[in-house]
Amino acid sequence: GCIPAQKDKPWPLSFAVQDPTVWGISITSWAAQKAGLTINGKVQSVRHTPANLVELAHVPSAPLAKLLDRMLKRSDNLIADSLSRALGHYYLKRAASYAAGADAVRGILKNKAGIDLGSALLADGSGLSAHNLITAKQMLEVLDYIALHDDELKLIGLLPVAGMSGTLGSRGSVQNPPLVKNVTAKTG
């Protein structure tokens, strides 16, 4: 993306948290201190919630359909990375990580679509890493599967449309006929 040279407000940026446990402990300690609370003991992460704890707050995630819509329309890499890690946790019952996410994607594509990613390297969920390596044939197999099974997957309707939505909404190269309103694509 582009950042304007003259900007009077801070530019909002989002980044994937590399270690959610360390971040969670750090942000909890910081927030308690800012609120004037004293913590007697150690802030720590637990794998299982002890029965005697009382939930003070709960923040539910947006529904998956909304997350996918935002991720695809706005090219939201933070959501892509987070969903990849969560997929690894949910599908494989392992700690959420990029490696677990990559293994889950491989397993799902193999079991559901018959697509073997073989030697492909999946380093993150967003595709930003230079270590992501996939052949054109493998990518085409995935895209063909999505196109042939979109009645079930419902992904194509979430993609940006030239001149209308998301990252293609104001992209100059697709603002004129015959492309405007006729190109549905994922940028990046």
Question: Can you name each region flagged by the protein language model?
Answer:
Residues 149-166, 174:
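Active/binding-pocket-proximal capping segment
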Residues 122, 159, 183:
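Short clusters of hydrophobic/aromatic residues that line enzyme substrate/ligand-binding pockets
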Residues 49-51, 100-101, 163, 176-180:
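A short linear-motif detector with a strong N-terminal bias
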Residues 1-153:
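A small/polar active-site loop signature that marks catalytic segments
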Residues 39, 166-170:
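Short low-complexity stretches enriched in small and charged residues
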Residues 54-60, 172-188:
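Short, Gly/Ser/Thr-enriched beta-strand-loop segments that form substrate-interacting elements
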Residues 20-21, 150, 170, 176-179:
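Extracytoplasmic
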